[in-house]
Amino acid sequence: MAVCIIDHDNIRGVIYFEPVHGKDKVLGSVIGLKSGTYSLIIHRYGDISRGCDSIGSPEIFIGNIFVNRYGVAYVYLDTDVNISTIIGKALSISKNDQRLACGVIGISYINEKNNTFSYN
C-alpha cells in the first residue's frame, strides 16, 4: 500500500493506493477546496522543494474527485496503476491545468506493520 499526504495552504488530505479484493483502489479524503471537480494526477518527480512547481510533468491521470459544498471530497476510484511504480513520485490535485496542492507518494506504515495489507 502507498500513501500521499497533502498539506498545502488550507488544502489537506490523505490518499491511499491499495489493493482491495484483487483490484487497485485510490481511497481517501481531501478538505479545503471550493466545491467542484478536480483531477488527481501522478507526476514524474517527488520533489516538492518548490511546492508543486518542482514535481515535473504529468504522467498518469488517476481520475476526478468531486468536492461538496462543505469543501470535502471523499475519494474512491479504481486505477490500473502499478503501486510499486509510483512510490517516490508526486500526486497533484489540479483544476484547469493548475496544480493547487501536491504531495509525495510513499510506502505506507501498514506495509511495514503487517507485511501485507488485507481489506476486511
From Swiss-Prot:
Tree of life domain: Viruses
Protein name: Cu-Zn superoxide dismutase-like protein OPG175
Disulphide connectivity of cysteines: C52-C102
One GO CC term on file: host cell cytoplasm
Hydrolase recorded as keyword: no
GO terms under biological process: superoxide metabolic process
Location in the cell: Virion; Host cytoplasm
Role played: Superoxide dismutase-like protein with no enzymatic activity.
Coiled-coil annotated spans: none
UniProt entry tagged with the keyword Disulfide bond: yes
Organism: Vaccinia virus (strain Tashkent)
InterPro entries per the UniProt record, alphabetical: SOD-like_Cu/Zn_dom_sf, SOD_Cu/Zn_/chaperone
Family named by the database record: Belongs to the Cu-Zn superoxide dismutase family.
Major location category of this protein: virion
GO molecular function: copper ion binding
Keywords for the protein's UniProt record, in alphabetical order: Disulfide bond, Host cytoplasm, Virion
Transmembrane spans: none
Organism ancestry: Viruses, Varidnaviria, Bamfordvirae, Nucleocytoviricota, Pokkesviricetes
